[in-house]
């Protein structure tokens, strides 16, 4: 039996994603890192929720995604799982959790399914990950691939740079996409690559492609929740579209609370609890006793 939210939407599964690709029905994906955010995103009708290792920056204040740990990722994945009823839930495997040999990599991935409640894990890399993906699928761990600009490779790439600009790089991206598609990934994230290259990959592979900075021709799009609400403290990437200024709204609300406390207008009498009238006499008796004891 499928789980449905109040509006009776059916649960999104890996089969749903394939069906959407075949019908040219765009797939939506956002990140979420906590219960409240995940509940809002899920109830808004987003198809996929990614507990991204970007939480290293958005939630924990790190400079990049590399420092976040397995325990931190599992902690946030469990919180999101408790909120999600509709979306397909994916957890990012953090840096050095799947670069450590096949057996330990499988064990780490399985923890996201068993302990975190994720329905798939996302790993970065191309054809060099095909063998690992085979092992993960053998262990009943669905995998989402991620090629192009892979943030965990920031030092090797020399920064966050658009990938796939040369013939050689385009050919490598095609080999990566084909290898992951054949390996059986349930979706493939294409990040930071030219629109034309993303369109070519999308037409070539059977798995749904999810773009982030890869143009409009992918099967779906993903953005970071904090980016679309202006809750980050750095200039946005070119591909980010901001849909609200939550930073301004939140700052305004916090300042208003501060001012109300300072001026004494919060809390008001209506926002305070009161003794019932019959108990007020008892309070007066207690106060009178205290006064008598002081004399």
Curated annotation (Swiss-Prot):
Binding residues for 3-methyl-2-oxobutanoate: 53-54, 92, 122
Gene Ontology MF annotations: 3-methyl-2-oxobutanoate hydroxymethyltransferase activity; magnesium ion binding
Pfam families: Pantoate_transf
Classification via Gene3D superfamilies: Phosphoenolpyruvate-binding domains
Active site: residue positions: 191
Keyword Cell division found: no
Alphabetic keyword roster: Cytoplasm, Magnesium, Metal-binding, Pantothenate biosynthesis, Transferase
Cofactor(s) needed for function: Mg(2+)
Pathway: Cofactor biosynthesis; (R)-pantothenate biosynthesis; (R)-pantoate from 3-methyl-2-oxobutanoate: step 1/2
A cellular-component GO term for this protein: cytoplasm
Main location: cytoplasm
SUPFAM superfamilies registered for this protein in UniProt: Phosphoenolpyruvate/pyruvate domain (SSF51621)
InterPro entries tied to this protein: Pantoate_hydroxy_MeTrfase (IPR003700), Pyrv/PenolPyrv_kinase-like_dom (IPR015813), Pyrv_kinase-like_dom_sf (IPR040442)
Residue ranges that the Swiss-Prot or TrEMBL entry lists as coiled coil: none
Recorded family membership: Belongs to the PanB family.
Function statement: Catalyzes the reversible reaction in which hydroxymethyl group from 5,10-methylenetetrahydrofolate is transferred onto alpha-ketoisovalerate to form ketopantoate.
PANTHER family, per the entry: 3-METHYL-2-OXOBUTANOATE HYDROXYMETHYLTRANSFERASE
Binding partners and assembly: Homodecamer; pentamer of dimers.
Full protein name: 3-methyl-2-oxobutanoate hydroxymethyltransferase
């Amino acid at each position: 039996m499928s789980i449905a939210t109040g509006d009776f939407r059916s649960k999104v599964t890996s089969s749903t994603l394939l069906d959407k690709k075949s019908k040219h029905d765009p797939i939506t994906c956002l990140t979420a890192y906590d219960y409240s955010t995940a509940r809002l995103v899920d109830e808004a009708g987003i198809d996929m929720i990614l507990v991204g290792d970007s939480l290293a920056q958005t939630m924990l204040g790190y400079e990049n995604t590399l420092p976040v740990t397995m325990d931190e990722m599992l902690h946030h994945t469990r919180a999101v799982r408790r909120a999600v009823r509709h979306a397909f839930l994916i957890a990012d495997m953090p840096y050095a959790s799947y670069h450590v040999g096949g057996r330990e990599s499988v064990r780490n991935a399985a923890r996201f399914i068993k302990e975190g409640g994720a329905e798939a894990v996302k790993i970065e890399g191309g054809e060099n990950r095909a063998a690992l993906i085979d092992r993960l699928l053998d262990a009943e761990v669905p995998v989402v691939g991620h090629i192009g600009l892979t943030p965990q490779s920031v030092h090797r790439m020399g920064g966050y740079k658009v990938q796939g600009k040369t013939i050689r790089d385009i050919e490598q991206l095609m080999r990566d996409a084909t290898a992951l598609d054949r390996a059986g990934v349930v979706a493939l994230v294409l990040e930071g690559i030219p629109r034309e290259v993303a369109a070519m990959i999308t037409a070539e592979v059977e798995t749904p492609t999810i773009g982030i900075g890869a143009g409009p021709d992918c099967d779906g799009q993903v953005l970071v929740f904090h980016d679309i609400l202006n809750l980050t403290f750095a200039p946005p990437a070119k591909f980010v579209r901001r849909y609200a200024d939550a930073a301004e709204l939140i700052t305004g609300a916090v300042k208003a609370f501060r001012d109300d406390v300072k001026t004494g207008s919060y809390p008001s009498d209506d926002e305070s609890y009161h003794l019932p009238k019959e108990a007020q006499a008892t309070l007066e008796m207690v106060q009178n006793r205290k006064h008598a004891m002081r004399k």
